[in-house]
Regions:
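A short SAM/SAH-binding and catalytic strip from SAM-dependent methyltransferases
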Residues: 125-139
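Conserved beta-strand signature within the Rossmann-like core of class I S-adenosyl-L-methionine
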Residues: 150-160
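Short alpha-helix
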Residues: 178-193
Length: 264
C-alpha cells in the first residue's frame, strides 16, 4: 500500500468514533461565553496566533468557531469587515458586545454550525479557525475553509489528542482515548494539493489558573465529563498534596497550520 491509497478523512472519522466523544452543545458553550469573553483578547495564545498572520492585501476576515471573537476582534481595526461564525448564540452576543465596547463598526456575526448550510457565508480574504476544528468530518471542514478564502487560511488544531493532561486522567483512574490530532489535517491538505506551513503554539492549560479545588474540579469535569464520587475523592486527595507546578500540568500545544489560497 502507498500513501495515495489511504483515505485520511475516513481514518480521522474512524479514530474520532473510537473516542465516543460527545460534542459540546451550543447551550454548554453559551454558559461559558461571559467567562471566556472577559479574557479573550488578553491571552498569550491570541497574541501568538495573530503574530503569525499575514494581513497584507486583505480587507475581510471570516472567523469560524469564533467564540467571543478572540482572533477576529484582535485584528478588526486593520480590516474593513470581520465576520464571526459560531453555533453558540451567546458567544456571538459576546463578540458583538465587545466590538461595540471597542467602537468597531465593521464586525458582524453569523449563527452557524460546521454542519449547516454555508451557502450564505461570505467569502473573505482571510479565513481563520482557531481551536475549532475537532469536528465530525474534518475533510469537509477543510474544504469549506479553503473555499471561503480568497487569500489565506489560518487554523490551529490540537497536538497529542488530549484536552486534559493525561496525568490528571491517571489521578482519577480514567483513561480517555485521544482525539485525532493535527497530523490527519496535514495529510488531508496534501491530498487536496495544498502544502501548508506548520508551526506550534504552546500555552498554559486551562487548569493553571484555577483559584481553588472546586474551580479545578469543575474545569476537569468540563473536559472529561461529570466525575463520579470516587473520581472526585481521588482528585481532591491528589490536589491537596500536589505542588502548584503539578496542579498546573503540561502546557497545551496547538499546531498552527496555514496556507495560501493558491497551492504552493
Amino acid at each position: 500500500m502507498t500513501i495515495e491509497a489511504i483515505d485520511f478523512g475516513r481514518l480521522y472519522r474512524d479514530h474520532l468514533a473510537t473516542t465516543q466523544r460527545t460534542r459540546k452543545t451550543a447551550s454548554a458553550w453559551d454558559s461559558r461565553a461571559a467567562g471566556m469573553a472577559s479574557k479573550a483578547l488578553n491571552s498569550r495564545y491570541a497574541e501568538e496566533f495573530v503574530a503569525r498572520m499575514d494581513l497584507q492585501g486583505a480587507t475581510s476576515l471570516l472567523d469560524v468557531g469564533c467564540g467571543p471573537g478572540t482572533i477576529g476582534l484582535a485584528v478588526a481595526d486593520k480590516l474593513q469587515r470581520v465576520v464571526g461564525l459560531d453555533y453558540s448564540s451567546a458567544m456571538l452576543g459576546a463578540m458583538r458586545a465587545k466590538a461595540a465596547e471597542m467602537q468597531l463598526a465593521n464586525v458582524e456575526t453569523l449563527h452557524r454550525a460546521w454542519e449547516d448550510d454555508w451557502s450564505d457565508v461570505p467569502e473573505c480574504d482571510i479565513v481563520v479557525a482557531s481551536r475549532s476544528t475537532t469536528v465530525e468530518d474534518i475533510a469537509t471542514a477543510l474544504e469549506l475553509l479553503h473555499a471561503k478564502a480568497h487569500l489565506r487560511v489560518y487554523l490551529t488544531h490540537l497536538v497529542g489528542g488530549h484536552f486534559t493532561d493525561p496525568a490528571i486522567q491517571a489521578v482519577i483512574g480514567r483513561r480517555v482515548p485521544s482525539v485525532p490530532d493535527y497530523i490527519y489535517l496535514l495529510n488531508i491538505l496534501h491530498r487536496m494539493g495544498i502544502h501548508p506551513r506548520l508551526d506550534y503554539i504552546a500555552h498554559e492549560n486551562r487548569l493553571a489558573d484555577a483559584v481553588d479545588f472546586d474551580d479545578f474540579a469543575r474545569r476537569v469535569g468540563w473536559s472529561l465529563g461529570e466525575l463520579a464520587d470516587d473520581e472526585m475523592a481521588r482528585l481532591r486527595t491528589w490536589y491537596e498534596h500536589a505542588t502548584p507546578q503539578e496542579r498546573q500540568g503540561q502546557p497545551m500545544r496547538w499546531a498552527f497550520i496555514s496556507w495560501e489560497k493558491t497551492p504552493c
